Amino acid sequence: MLTYGIDVSANNPEDAPGSMPGMSFVMIKATEGHTYVSPTQKAQATAARRHGRAVGFYHFLWPGNIGLQAHHFVEKCASTPGDILAVDWEQTTDNTHASNAEKD
């Protein structure tokens, strides 16, 4: 059996987590780098929970000072006990990414 989910960010409507039928979970972008905080993460989590979806939050990782970014994510994420926390490790908009050494 497959489980379907979506990931959303501030680029999606606040009610996006509830607007797609058949989704079991929603991963919500909470933070990026060491300064950005999503202004829609709380509303998106509320919408997901209202529709019975499991909720997770992710941090978009930039190269450099991974410890500071991890602290920023934990401090600013709108998670509650039982939510999933994850890191989105991919190429950034300026074509860079955290190295394997930084990631580990």
Task: Set out the residue ranges of the language-model regions.
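Substrate-binding cleft of extracellular glycoside hydrolase catalytic domains
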Residues: M1-D104
